Regions:
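Active-site bordering "gate/hinge" segments
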Residues: 1-243, 248-249, 363-390
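A short secondary-structure junction signal
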Residues: 138-141, 162-165, 203-206, 214-217, ...
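A broad structural signal for short, well-ordered beta-strand segments within beta-sheet-rich domains
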Residues: 186, 252, 259, 264, ...
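Oxyanion-binding "anion nests"
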Residues: 233-278
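A generic structural signal for well-ordered coil/turn residues at beta-strand boundaries
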Residues: 240, 253, 292, 315-317, ...
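Dual-mode signal for accessory low-complexity, basic/Gly-rich regions
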Residues: 266-335, 366
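Internal helix-turn-beta structural module
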Residues: 315-321, 325-389
């Protein structure tokens, strides 16, 4: 029976090529042969990697994909086909937050404890991280220090495997570049959020900066980390003003954030649990850097919703802003800006019809080259955005 996917528009395909680990690694990395590769996962108790004991616990479904699809895939032919070396599997203590720095301790299935900095980063050319929490930011920093390449694929599920990791990333890259060229060097972007009959507008100041793309290709000698599934145009805002509604991921509480000077400075209650809003207010008071708006991102791909932000933020018609660190994106919000290390996260706030049905993205517009262009209306690409990829 054919799988029926949840899509944002009829333009999204319902059929994709079968997943191929060999094709994915070849397209993303263009390996020359001889590269030493390893796989990383996160666990609440990383010693559970011994004898792959974590496979007996159904809560580690993401990590099971790392073992069943990637580790076994390499071992059962892909390493030989691509002339890879290694193929080892390591676990580390789960960080508990998106893009928090990783611990140095790594654990192997044979029970050994190793050091990432001494035993792993210097000795691998390609590192694949399949985890619960994103490790893109810390791995990007380590890649620059030690010269390896890699990919982060947090939150993996079957839909992601069958769709977002099965597409042709040469095509994804080409389309992302077309969109980037039509959106780069914008002066600002304004987003109109509609909720409960009211419209709230957030302006993100870009000052003509060069737009960047997450396009899935990580080729050549330069150290880099691809975030997969890919397909995104993004900026690191230089300022922001206005307000926007926020839906809490844990309990669905809706609040209205006030933004000034590029950061969230206050938050007020709309509906749900008032204690959730009070906790957010307290966090902003204690560690103001947690409110910094470090990213504005637009999805570029025609993909189905997976229920995981890692894919869903890459869908054309969705938009996300992110708070916190953005050094992995070329921004200046580094972990040392935060009063508490545990707060130095990069948290995407995704607006998509399946995730935030209470909030409509009525319009997104861009000021560029002296004129305004409408990019998105009601979660669908507007004529200008469509024209960039036709």
């Amino acid at each position: 029976m054919a799988t029926s996917y949840n899509v944002i528009s009829p333009e999204v395909p319902q059929h994709y090529p079968p997943f191929s680990l060999s094709r994915l690694l070849t397209t993303v990395f263009h390996p020359k042969g001889g590269e030493r590769v390893c796989i990383l996962i996160d666990l609440d108790d990383p010693t559970k990697v011994k004898d792959f004991a974590f496979l007996n616990d159904p809560q580690w479904s993401i990590q099971r994909y790392a073992h069943d699809v990637f580790y076994n895939g390499l071992k059962n032919g892909v390493s030989q086909e691509l002339n890879f070396q290694g193929g080892e599997f390591y676990a580390y203590q789960i960080t508990g937050g998106s893009n928090l720095d990783m611990p140095d301790a790594a654990f192997a299935p044979d029970g050994r404890q190793l050091s990432f900095e001494k035993d792993i980063y210097p000795h691998y050319d390609l590192i694949l991280c399949i985890s619960t929490f994103s490790a893109t930011a810390p791995l990007t920093a380590w890649a620059k220090k030690f010269g390896f390449r890699g990919a982060t694929m947090h939150g993996m599920n079957q839909t992601i495997l069958e769709t977002g990791l099965s597409v042709d990333y040469d095509t994804v890259s080409a389309e992302a570049e077309k969109l980037r060229l039509g959106m780069t060097r914008a002066d600002w972007v304004e987003i109109d959020f509609a909720i409960n009959g009211n419209t709230h507008t957030l302006r993100l100041v870009l000052n003509g900066q060069e737009a960047q793309k997450s396009h899935g290709l990580c080729r050549g000698p330069e150290p880099d980390i691809a975030n997969l599934p890919a397909g995104e145009i993004y900026y690191t805002p230089e300022g922001a003003e206005g307000e926007f509604p926020l839906k809490n991921e844990h309990d669905g509480t809706l609040s209205l954030t006030k933004v000034s000077g590029g950061r969230i400075v206050d938050v007020s209650f709309i509906s749900g649990n008032e204690e959730t809003v009070k906790a957010h207010q307290q966090k902003l008071r204690e560690d103001p850097a947690t409110g910094d708006l470090g990213e504005l991102g637009f999805g570029t791909q025609l993909l189905p919703f997976s229920g995981r932000d890692i894919q869903d933020e890459k869908i054309r018609g969705t938009i996300h802003v992110a708070t916190g660190r953005n050094d992995h994106l070329g921004g200046g919000f580094t972990p040392d800006k935060f009063k508490k290390a545990i707060n130095a996260t990069h948290d995407d706030i995704l607006f998509a019809p399946h995730k935030t049905p209470e909030i409509n993205i009525a319009q997104v517009r861009m000021q560029r080259d002296g004129k305004q262009e409408i990019l998105i209306e009601n979660y669908l690409p507007a004529a200008y955005m469509k024209s960039l990829v036709e």
